[in-house]
Amino acid sequence: MERTLDIAIAGGGIVGLTAALSLHAAGFRPTVYEAVSQLAPLGVGVNLLPHAVRELSELGLLDELLEIGVAIQDLNYLTASGELVWHEPRGLVAGYNWPQIAIHRGQLQMFLLDKVRERLGADAIRMGQELVGVETVSQRVHARFVDRASDKDTAIEADVLIGADGIHSAVRRQFYPDEGAPRWNGITLWRSTSPVVAPMGGKAMIWAGRSSQKFVAYPIGKDPKTGLDRLNWICDLKVTDDGAPPPRDWNRPGDRADFLPRFADWRWVGVDVPAIVAASGPIYEFPMVDRDPLPQWTFDHVTLMGDAAHPMYPIGSNGATQGIIDARVFAWHLAKADSVEETLRCYEADRREITARIVLMNRQQGPDRILDLAAERLGNGSGTLKDLLPMAEREAVALSYKQTAGFDPATINSRDSFSVF
């Protein structure tokens, strides 16, 4: 493919910035259009699975990521009383050739932003540009943006436009105007970080409880003020029926009083949920939402990527991971294909079906289903967890999700690289 193509990326989040770096590595020079006027290191933690870390490693970013994140070594599923349901090694310890990295989402975004400016130049990112219209005319994309500072329209043309602008994607809305709000499963998440000594050795992930009431925690680095571990934590509670309209006010400040009483006695060896929550900074409240899988991502020379294409519940650590893989696959196809049309066709064929399967599996709780199985068996039967939920059944749940999502070690370690050169 001609390396002089005009490529526009709507969205300067993790996926859009990874797409820019991937396209640059393949010999192209894209331009990123971001709606906010200034990016800031916002958010809490995110997990990057080994197949996403592989892609960032091949972009030359691994060593620096390990300096600001944590290489996770194991995952532990616990009952609400602290009994171990399932343990498995993660990352390099599990036999992958790349680690699993837990990192602050905002730090990751700012790191990628710096790399885009360093490699592509400061003018590769246009801030404060809100997309308001897009169409393809004679094999050229015509897009309109509103400058948030001046309120003036800006018109651009490109050979291809990537919509990587998140779950509320303006690009997606151009082609699915009647889709409406994201789908809420009735679960609310309260999230924050706390400066504490991370439990279970300092490089472990903890999933405890069941889908209707769950605690998740993992370290994402060091707290700059105290030098302690920066522990990302999430408390989930089912608050209404599946399919109810989601709250209008997203990512709003959370109140401990709304959830902490339900976790008041969640104290186990090395894990004290009330103490962890009490030590936190600001708490944020989110609805757990996704969208139905789409029948089509690509319209003429416009396509979708990341959460704009396949937003999913934050289960199984696959949200950012799948978006990063989208970006790398797209860049590889653009470099190898004979036309933009072939690129878009192959990209969607490679990515749409597998991400749709993950979205639907996450609605069934994905690997976290093992917690519901344990809670149901213990609640309905008499006996030990060992007898009520055989280890072979637990292993089958974990393996099934890895195989469906394409991240069992054999698959990741043996597949060909998406690097062009």
Mark where each language-model region is.
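Acidic/histidine metal-binding catalytic segments
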Residues: 67-68, 124, 265-281, 340-345, ...
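Catalytic P-loop NTPase motifs of RecA-like helicase/translocase cores
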Residues: 39-40, 170-171, 311-313
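Conserved mid-domain beta->alpha element of the FAD-binding
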Residues: 8-27, 31-36, 162-163, 190, ...
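Short, solvent-exposed loop/turn segments at secondary-structure boundaries
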Residues: 43-45, 100, 246-251, 315-319, ...
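Conserved FAD/dinucleotide-binding core of flavoprotein oxidoreductases
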Residues: 84-109, 113, 146-156, 195-285
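C-terminal helical "tail/cap" subdomain of flavin- and related membrane-associated enzymes
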Residues: 2-5, 67, 82, 295, ...
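Conserved N-terminal glycine-rich FAD pyrophosphate-binding loop of Rossmann-like flavoproteins
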Residues: 37-55
